[in-house]
UniProtKB/Swiss-Prot annotation:
The keyword Nucleus applies. Residues 444-457 have a biased composition (Polar residues). SUPFAM superfamilies: Protein kinase-like (PK-like). This is Meiotic driver SPOK2. GO terms for cellular component: cytoplasm; nucleus. Signal peptide: none annotated.
Length: 775
């Protein structure tokens, strides 16, 4: 091969190598492109995967949020929601448009001293908060967050300016949550066993109880004054109306805390009142309530009619006056309603109050300012939830449950002591030594309550009640904090008359003794304890018949072995009135001020002490006599149904002295009757049928009941039927003609019975042919 051919071959080989190199390079670039494409696809897939994960996480969070908002909440979660969504939802109007007029407190009791309630802040509240938290734990017992938020939206939509608006706010944001939490506690066996939390409710319908009679009943409009005058002139005990120790006044707080008693009755644990937010300036609350002589200063300024020229001082003095008057109003309620606990609710604050029954002149106050104490919202409020309004009011309620409200004889005794030791606005305490201390000095002054439990448990209250202390983290048996009766040596809290109150309380606690004068006194304190007499017994008394051997008290009725009643109907009524004249509490006890009451009166259990007759009375106020008299005419028209379809009517009596009620009202008139029975149980299938039978029976006698309240239809086991009560709204008409003869009717009465009824019912005309009384 020539050199030329060899060169050509080498060139071809070079070109082929170059081509192969370029081809390899192209393949490498193609592979690189494919790798980059694969990488891009992988990154895209990863991005889609991450997006899917993010979307799934977001959806999971939303589901969890919705589940969280719709599921029930724990105790701490509920406190958080109530404060954040309800309490903070309050929006106040421009207060400059509203009057800052003073609360009307002239003539009302006010304390000499105002002191910090440090025992509540340092002992009671921490104890009860820990106790509730330990009982509830992490159980989801309370309403969901979305429910609380929805209510908060409604609250924030309405501006609050006056007391009515504050009323609605307090009910929604504070009272309803507190009642819900206490309801859970009441069903818990540990709390129930320790009597820490009974069934409870807030009640704001007090004004219905003692409002003046409007005359809207079945009674004739012109019967009251005339018939009362006739009764006073014609009655066997004609005497002028005696004056009572106290003047009845319109002492009606905005609300009371009602608790159920073990026996089924109801009693009040505390009193509360609402105030418009602009009438209790929160910027002055702490400084004002730290002044021991706040009331003395305010009363002196008002009496002297002195105003400072400095605008800031004027604002402070006006704020102090409004706060002092708000406290005075509730203090007066606490005294006259016989309770040691009360509070003022003013939207942005609660003023929790306590009075020691051994020291009437000192009012203890714990200001609750949740907005300041809890602060701004954060991710973790756990350590500040005890400062919320709901948490503090729960502890206040639980504290109040350990004290008993005074009633009857003990209430009147306590009011006698209060009248002797307290001044009414705007009288001055003559012995007040105003020291002119600054608020800081006053707040740091020694107080007996720092080391003393006596201001928590009054000497006048029943002993033997303990407060169980339970550690949240301990499984050991609960420790017990006994209610001590000892007082701090630094100050004597005893006031004149306190020993008399303790004596009355001790007698009430011991119950009746056996026989003698002391036994009568105990009976006056404790009230009747015997079983009710039977319908047949009291009907026999009224008709002049033999004793009922089935009456549980027949041995007390029987004298000298006789089978006849020892007194007639007229003598019976006269003796009851004489017994109540000596003391309205002698053999007489209100059954249940809050539960056993009708539209116009309250139920009493009475015993005619010498003979053991035990029956009931329907007591009412001075201005409601006409309605009782009307009811007496109804019973007269239903005469031969008495003791069967309706109770046995035994006449009207007057309590000249009056049986004292919470709030300084007095039961003055009382209608005496046999005990009708109990409310039918829900399991009684034929209750409605029996009710219609009884209604038909009275309709056949010309009576339309006019009050369909369920409480007016009672099951009487002795008669095996439904009895009807409360005829103050009933309407009378002549019986239908021809009158249907009821299978339930009794035999016709003897002629002499009508004359006996004429003495019982007073100057009413007797129509003997119809055996009924008409006006």
């Amino acid at each position: 091969m020539s050199d030329k051919d060899r060169i050509a071959q080498l060139l071809r080989e070079l070109e082929e190598a170059k081509a192969r190199e370029e081809e390899a390079k192209a393949r490498a670039e193609e592979a690189k492109a494919r790798a980059e494409e694969a990488k891009a696809r992988a990154e895209e897939a990863k991005a889609r995967e991450e997006e899917a994960k993010a979307r799934e996480a977001q959806e999971r969070c939303e589901r969890e949020r919705l589940q969280l908002e719709h599921r029930n909440t724990t105790f701490l979660e509920y406190l958080h929601n109530c404060h954040r969504h309800l309490y903070n939802a309050l929006r106040l109007t421009n207060t400059s448009r509203y009057s800052t007029g003073y609360t009307k407190v002239v003539g009302k009791y006010y304390p000499k001293r105002l002191r910090p309630w440090t025992y509540f802040a340092n002992v009671l509240h921490p104890h009860y908060f820990d106790l509730v938290q330990s009982i509830c734990g992490q159980r989801q017992l309370f309403e969901p967050a979305n429910t609380t938020k929805s209510l908060g939206t409604i609250i924030s939509d309405h501006l609050a300016g006056n007391e009515k608006a504050i009323d609605r706010f307090e009910v929604d944001a504070v009272e309803r949550p507190v009642q819900g939490i206490l309801k859970v506690l009441a069903t818990h066996k540990e709390a129930g066993k320790a009597s820490i939390c009974p069934e409870f409710r807030f009640s704001a319908n007090l004004r219905e109880l003692t409002q003046k009679d409007d005359g809207s009943s079945g009674a004739d409009d012109n019967t009251s004054d005339g018939s009362l005058e006739r009764r006073q002139q014609a009655g066997p005990n004609k005497r002028p109306t005696s004056k009572r120790k106290y003047i009845c006044s319109n002492r009606q707080p905005d609300g009371v805390g009602i608790r159920m008693q073990p026996g089924g009755g109801q009693t009040h644990a505390f009193i509360y009142d609402y105030k418009a937010a602009h009438k209790v300036a929160i910027e002055y609350i702490r400084s004002a309530t730290a002044k021991e002589h706040l009331f003395h200063e305010v009363v002196a300024r008002i009496n002297d009619d002195k105003l400072s020229r400095d605008e800031e001082v004027q604002r402070r003095e006006q704020a102090e006056a409004l706060i002092a008057m708000a406290l005075t109003q509730v203090f007066d309620y606490m005294i006259t309603y016989g309770v040691s606990y009360g509070y003022v609710a003013a939207g942005r604050c609660l003023l929790l109050l306590y009075v020691d029954r051994d020291d009437w002149q000192t009012l203890y106050c714990h200001p609750c300012l949740p907005a300041d104490d809890v602060g701004e919202p954060t991710n973790d409020w756990t350590d500040r939830l005890s400062h919320t309004a709901v948490a503090q009011l729960i502890s206040f309620c639980l504290s109040s449950f350990q004290s008993e409200a005074l009633e009857g004889q003990s209430l009147e005794t306590a009011l006698s002591i209060a009248k002797a030791t307290l001044k009414t606005w705007s009288e001055s305490y003559a012995d007040v030594a105003y020291l002119g201390l600054e608020p800081a000095e006053l707040s740091s002054a020694p107080s007996s309550q720092n080391t003393d439990i006596s201001e928590y448990t009054s000497k006048a209250e029943p002993t033997g009640r303990n407060v169980a202390l339970r550690s949240q983290s301990s499984c050991k048996p609960a420790a017990v904090l006994p209610q001590s009766n000892e007082h701090d040596d630094e100050e004597d809290h005893s006031e004149p008359g306190a020993s008399r109150l303790r004596l009355a309380a001790n007698k009430r606690k011991r119950g009746p003794s056996s026989g003698g004068e002391d036994g009568d006194i105990a009976m006056a304190d404790s009230g009747p304890t015997k079983q009710y007499c039977t319908q047949a017994c009291l009907l026999g008394l009224k008709r002049g018949k033999d004793l009922d051997e089935k009456c549980p008290n027949v041995s007390l009725h029987r004298f000298d072995g006789s089978s006849r009643h020892p007194v007639n109907a007229h003598r019976f009524t006269d003796m009851v009135e004489q017994q109540l004249l000596l003391s309205p509490y002698k053999g007489c006890r209100m059954v249940d001020f809050w539960g056993k009451r009708g539209a116009m009166g309250w139920l009493f259990k009475l015993e005619l002490l010498p003979y053991g007759y035990t029956f009931v009375g329907k007591g009412t106020l001075e201005d409601r006599l006409s309605r009782l008299e009307h009811e007496g005419r109804v019973y007269a028209q239903l005469d031969h149904l008495q003791g069967d379809v309706v109770p046995v009517y035994l006449g009207l009596v007057r309590l000249d002295r009056g049986y004292i009620l919470p709030g300084l009202e007095f039961v003055v008139h009382m209608m005496l009757m046999s005990w009708a029975g109990q409310t039918p149980s829900a399991s009684m299938d034929d209750a409605e049928t029996l009710k219609r039978e009884s209604l038909t029976a009275i309709w056949n006698e010309g009576v339309v009941h006019g009050d369909e309240n369920r409480a007016n239809y009672l099951w009487n086991a002795e008669r095996g039927r439904i009895m009807i009560i409360d005829f103050d709204r009933a309407h009378l008409s002549p019986p239908p003609k021809p009158r249907a003869v009821s299978r339930l009717s009794k035999p016709k009465r003897k002629r002499g019975d009508s004359e006996a009824d004429a003495q019982l019912f007073g100057p009413l005309e007797i129509n003997r042919s119809k055996h009924r009384i008409r006006t």
